[in-house]
Amino acid sequence: MFILPPPQEPLLGAHTSAAGGLHNALYEGRDIGATTVQLFTANQRQWKRRALTQEMVDQFRIALNETSLSYIMSHAGYLNNPGAPNPEILEKTRVCMHQEIADCISLGISFVNFHPGAALSDSKESCLDRAITSFSQMAPLFENHPPLVVLLETTAGQGSLIGSSFEELAYLIQGIKALIPIGVCLDTCHIFAAGYDISSVAGWEQVLKHFDAVIGLSFLRAIHLNDSVFALGKNKDRHAPIGEGCIGSDSFCFLMQDERTRMLPKYLETPGGPDLWTKEIRYLQKVC
């Protein structure tokens, strides 16, 4: 199995808009001073995906070359529930997962990021096992060793969502890692909401030590940079601009500097759009 190596330089970007064409997300990234971006490759709130045409692939790959952006991340749709107890939703999810991964391979995207799932009326244990089956069924797509890694995003712990604890993510990874390239995308707002105190350097030291012990730092492949509107452990997923929430700017400067996290691709999902992202990228690159 081919495992995508880490980048050779720090990469920083944001979730940019693919309005008017997937390639436009790359050009918006270039315009805000990014070196990588995250995007939706299809409407994130619909089951039906538009078919990827050769023209779309060509436009995207030309934009990749022209912008010199790398380690692009696709964020899978919000309707997906890899651990859904409802058989119809589970089957729809698996079809979408297959299409999403296939499109990412065609486009030359490096990461495809999924929310692990929600148990809803069922137990989390059963949800975790169904999610493992869902991701395992994607193995045939990786037979030709594409340079793509599937990422499980940390969640805030609201409702019946799985993936808010490192232990749950470790369980998923242990069940998947032999079949597909798998890793974790750590969302700073989400883990803070789930009770991991990253508001200080000392806090980060404890969290990274715990992550390494439970999952292994080699599985940490990317970071979503978001401050948090709500306080520690509230299980509420509300992003704030960098330095304007309950986590604080020192936490993000730590991520930019520490040898364990400095080279991990980082993607802003903060509210405010391109004007704010330009300022945040400049701040994180120059001030931190």
From Swiss-Prot:
One of its GO terms (molecular function) is deoxyribonuclease IV (phage-T4-induced) activity. PROSITE patterns: AP_NUCLEASE_F2_1 (PS00729), AP_NUCLEASE_F2_2 (PS00730), AP_NUCLEASE_F2_3 (PS00731), AP_NUCLEASE_F2_4 (PS51432). Its cofactor is Zn(2+). Its EC number is 3.1.21.2. Zn(2+) 3 binds at residues 190, 237, 239. InterPro entries: AP_endonuc_2, AP_endonuc_F2_Zn_BS, Xyl_isomerase-like_sf, Xyl_isomerase-like_TIM-brl. Zn(2+) 1 binds at residues 75, 115, 153. Keywords: DNA damage, DNA repair, Endonuclease, Hydrolase, Metal-binding, Nuclease, Zinc. Pfam families: AP_endonuc_2. Zn(2+) 2 binds at residues 153, 187, 224, 269. One of its GO terms (biological process) is base-excision repair. Gene3D superfamilies: Divalent-metal-dependent TIM barrel enzymes. It catalyses: Endonucleolytic cleavage to 5'-phosphooligonucleotide end-products. The keyword Aminoacyl-tRNA synthetase does not apply. Binds 3 Zn(2+) ions. Belongs to the AP endonuclease 2 family. PANTHER family: APURINIC-APYRIMIDINIC ENDONUCLEASE, ENDONUCLEASE IV ENDODEOXYRIBONUCLEASE IV. Endonuclease IV plays a role in DNA repair. It cleaves phosphodiester bonds at apurinic or apyrimidinic (AP) sites, generating a 3'-hydroxyl group and a 5'-terminal sugar phosphate. This is Probable endonuclease 4. The gene is nfo.
